[in-house]
Amino acid sequence: MAALKDQLIHNLLKEEHVPQNKITVVGVGAVGMACAISILMKDLADELALVDVMEDKLKGEMMDLQHGSLFLRTPKIVSGKDYSVTANSKLVIITAGARQQEGESRLNLVQRNVNIFKFIIPNVVKYSPHCKLLVVSNPVDILTYVAWKISGFPKNRVIGSGCNLDSARFRYLMGERLGVHALSCHGWILGEHGDSSVPVWSGMNVAGVSLKTLHPELGTDADKEQWKQVHKQVVDSAYEVIKLKGYTTWAIGLSVADLAESIMKNLRRVHPISTMLKGLYGIKEDVFLSVPCVLGQNGISDVVKVTLTSEEEAHLKKSADTLWGIQKELQF
């Protein structure tokens, strides 16, 4: 008696399954899973692979997502401790690493995470030599440099999530003050993701109307409205969320899916993300910092040359020096 499947279905074609739009997420902690669900909800991949060292947690997360398949449009969700499950990925998102503790600076995490990357990156490269690498783990600017060094990839294919979230937080808070949706509030935070990020006050606008032109004290200590506080809130926000709920997830997950969409759909949108800045803004070392970048199917194809004040440029240079001071001490 023929099996039920054979009675029901007549096969016409022996297919070899090679995914066309595969995305891998390395690390199934709170951030990794927020990235995964955000990507699934945006229908960006035909296959999603999850990788972690904690096998039970990994299998549980995979099964939980698979059970939602009816409500998703990603036909294959796989997982494994072995990196062979990641083969043929277009995009590999790295969220694995030691988690930032309450009150711990992002830079303090660094050597702990370098050691983790020494295992992850060669395995990713082995199975997906043509992928784009999107680094999310903190401190993101330094770890993007680490991923670039270990992978041997050209710099366009190694991207740090950088200030994409900082800028999104900034635009949200700007919108709250002005009573306008964040999408219509334009403002950029550049430089280091974290404590020494640089708000570009001159670029803040709604409908092309410059806030700095209307309110020349914007971002200065003399400002009666204290817009500087908005940037301070951005810097403090991750620490506050970590203090309140233990970690940050949803905003970073949505932010990463936003970047993944630009890459997978070759949108060529401009994002404030971490890229190799040597030779720009007076920076002479191999450091990764966030500037507005054109993001598409080849990763970062172009960088927008932002007009910075001498103070802003000095701030960026100081961040670069701080990062380089740490990078040159790293043990690979």
UniProtKB/Swiss-Prot annotation:
Question: What does this gene product do?
Answer: Interconverts simultaneously and stereospecifically pyruvate and lactate with concomitant interconversion of NADH and NAD(+).
Its recorded name reads L-lactate dehydrogenase A chain
InterPro entries recorded for this chain?
Answer: L-lactate/malate_DH, L-lactate_DH, L-lactate_DH_AS, Lactate/malate_DH_C, Lactate/malate_DH_N, Lactate_DH/Glyco_Ohase_4_C, NAD(P)-bd_dom_sf
Q: How does it assemble?
A: Homotetramer. Interacts with PTEN upstream reading frame protein MP31.
Where is the signal peptide, in residue numbers? none
Which residue positions does N6-acetyllysine occur at? K5, K14, K57, K81, K118, K126, K224, K232, K243, K318
Sites of Phosphotyrosine modification: Y239
Any GO molecular function: L-lactate dehydrogenase activity
Catalytic activity entry: (S)-lactate + NAD(+) = pyruvate + NADH + H(+)
Carrying N6-succinyllysine, the residues are K5, K118, K318
Q: Where does NAD(+) bind?
A: 29-57, 99, 138
